[in-house]
Amino acid sequence: MSRSISRRSLALCVATATSLSVAAPASSAAIVNNVIEHSAADASLKLTPVGTYESGVYAESAAEIVAFHPDSNRILTVNAHAGQIDVLDASAPANPTLIGSISAGEGKEINSVAVRPDGLAVAAVQQADKTEDGEALFFNAAAADLDTAEVGRVMVGALPDNVHLTADGGYALLANEGEPSNELNAEGTDYVTDPEGSVSVIKLPEAVEAPTQADARIAGFTAFDDQPLPEGVRVFGPSGHDSKPSIDFEPEYITSQDGKAFVSLQEANAIGVIDIESATVEKILPAHIADHSQVPLDPSNKDDAAELRTLPVKGLSMPDSIGAFTAGGQTYFATANEGEAREWGIKEKDGGSGVYTDEVELKDLVEDGKVCEGALGDVNVEELADKKHAGNLKLSNASGWNEEKGCFDELYAYGSRSFSIYDSEGNVVFDSGAEFEKITAELNEPGIFHHNADNEEAEFDDRSDNKGPEPEALTIGTVGERTYAFIGAERVGGIFVYDVTDPATASFVTYVNNRDFSTDEFAAAGDLGPEGFAFVDKADSPNGEHLLIVGNEVSGTTTVYNVEDLLKADEDNQDDADDHDNEDKSSQSSHSSTATIAVGSLIGVIAAVAAAVGLLNAPGVRETVLSFAPAPLREQLEKFL
């Protein structure tokens, strides 16, 4: 674990060294003093938070999905709280500033946004009544006057929750979740309304203008209502509900590669494959199921320990974010395996007709005699049901039920606490298993880092019984010749980075968490609840560096990270060394002159660092100062520091 402060502050110190003055460090409550960093010994990448925009709105989804438009250097941040897209000027990544917004209209919400290189942007708009058809709102992200940036809208399916643009910019794809109404019928046996889930496939014009309604087609799931589904794919609901794929499948997140789209069907524990040109769902793939008798997890929030153990329980991956990429000429997609229960209705004591949910605790199934005899092997069932072991672990009663026996012969928890990589046929080629929780358990230290904390409270072990770190956000980026997956942990926070260049042998690179666990005060806690990621290639970046932009729904912050290629840094250092070794020894006078300049620069740097001696006391500052010093001076400066 290492800690760091703003790299921008240190850059200013070094850049102004020769004038013997130090610029005042930039400060932001959203970039904490002690950024958590845990990396592999051979880490090829480094993440450093450099700037943030603070909405000042907490626990209200004021910063969710993010997108970046290179030509205007603008970040588009979904502010669901206000029903708008916040437009940020990121020309200085260390200081993103709000310049305006795009509104969905009174009573409407925006759930997602994406933007094309020419500035054509599309937002997914949810109606005040979420069961009604939503809208795709098109606007010019580079418009000088954002009040007139909107160029049109088309209707899409109910509750568009995510929007994705194909790589060629030819199509906008919207995942229409089609969630049921919040209320049940008078008998409490069915939803009042439950619209179909679908994917809108919208052909886009070449210009920055809106498509017509005729350009929007719907890819639905009706064709699968009468077909057998792959094992592990779930269709379920209240007792009086007409459960079938066309209604029960709720598209969550979408990605595409080479003419095919892949959409996560979270509650169904499935992935849909869509042919984009024909706007047709071709097949349904079962999502990964973890075997926790082999892959350990931390199942208890009552044992006062960061302890992983194996259990006779399965884990439904139930993916949220999904990202496609190519490797070796083949298509793959990665998923963040969050998990999600269904819970709809209003309690009778609150004037409703009851609540439907598939969530149940392990101890309740045991105490009610609903676990089939021998189903859990030779495990002591009473011990398993103890709250300090796994009694509070949240399970789904929609899986594992043996109708003939009238009991559960398998137990299924929500989420696999991992991320997975699939090939285009749906075969799982890699899963991170227990690595996320092993890392956070290793980092656990009171007041410094709290394993399985929630995103609104920093209490240690709080989420162990309920999806653990809850991986939700995911994006793919290429740095140098390597491909990386960035995965966000919604609850404990932070970003896991894996090298997925060879998908079958993907490996952990680093974990960074810009959070202060010593406080529950939102304004001082840093980033809470990473919801959406946008990777920016250095060719498109305002500062010439790879960037990762993160929308944090609980803290309401939009934070920019520098993504440093450590492999490239190593190569540059080696080149410097080689150049030095190969210099002509006959040019001694030239060397003397260079040395004189170097010594003068060194004196300036030392003077500046001395002026900033307060910064030197902070852990991690010494290393960062050295990283900014010219290569020939580092050895001498290192001795001084």
Residue ranges, per PLM feature:
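Selective for proline/serine-rich intrinsically disordered segments
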Residues: 2, 7, 23, 94, ...
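Secretory targeting and sorting signals
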Residues: 2-30
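Structural motif marking the loop-to-transmembrane transition
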Residues: 6, 505, 595-596
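Low-complexity, intrinsically disordered/propeptide-like segments
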Residues: 13-15, 23, 50, 101, ...
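Intrinsically disordered/low-complexity terminal segments and short unstructured peptides
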Residues: 15-17, 147, 165, 593-595
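Short stretches within intrinsically disordered, low-complexity N-terminal or propeptide regions
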Residues: 17-19, 25, 145, 174, ...
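Composition-driven, intrinsically disordered low-complexity tracts enriched in small residues
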Residues: 27-29, 572-641
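Beta-sheet-rich non-transmembrane sensory/scaffold domains
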Residues: 30-571
